[in-house]
Amino acid sequence: SIKKSGFGPNLFDEWRYLDHGEPGLDNSKRKINKDFVLNLARYKNGSILIARENFGCGSSREHAPWALLDFGIRVVIASSFADIFYGNCFKNGILPITLEKTIMDQVFTKVQNKVGYEITVNLEKQKIYDDSEIAHFEIDSFKKSCLMDGLDDIGLTLKNKIDIQNFEKKYQEIFPWLKGG
């Protein structure tokens, strides 16, 4: 697909639904797996996904972050990520946060035992909170800036649009025979 949308209804398809999905099938008419965590009422409309080790393994295409984003997920917190998936998250406006396994275990315990448990992420301060601070997380300053400013690769390029146009104009003056026709 060349569109970045429409993947959310198929996120975790084999776990969310009890039947076999097909391209073009109306997912609203499919049999829901009521036991799957993201189908539970208490997790509806959540924007932070907590996960375990090596999250995103096998998801080397950008379709995986597109599906998460389309589903409403803006942050994924896990003890580790597949490398390509991790990079693709940043390219698509999702914040992947890596925390130690012991901290993740504590978060999972709280989520399972406390109905209404919520966590928030403060990207600027690089902190995760519930009733108190859970953890500080590290993030590359450039990637942080891009997420804070809502910039993807194209947006970054367009920030320099005037400089690029000026360069192209001067370049064509110096090398007029290279100008396309």
Question: In which residue ranges do the predicted regions lie?
Answer:
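Cytosolic catalytic domains that perform sulfur/thiol-centered chemistry
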Residues: 1-52, 56-181
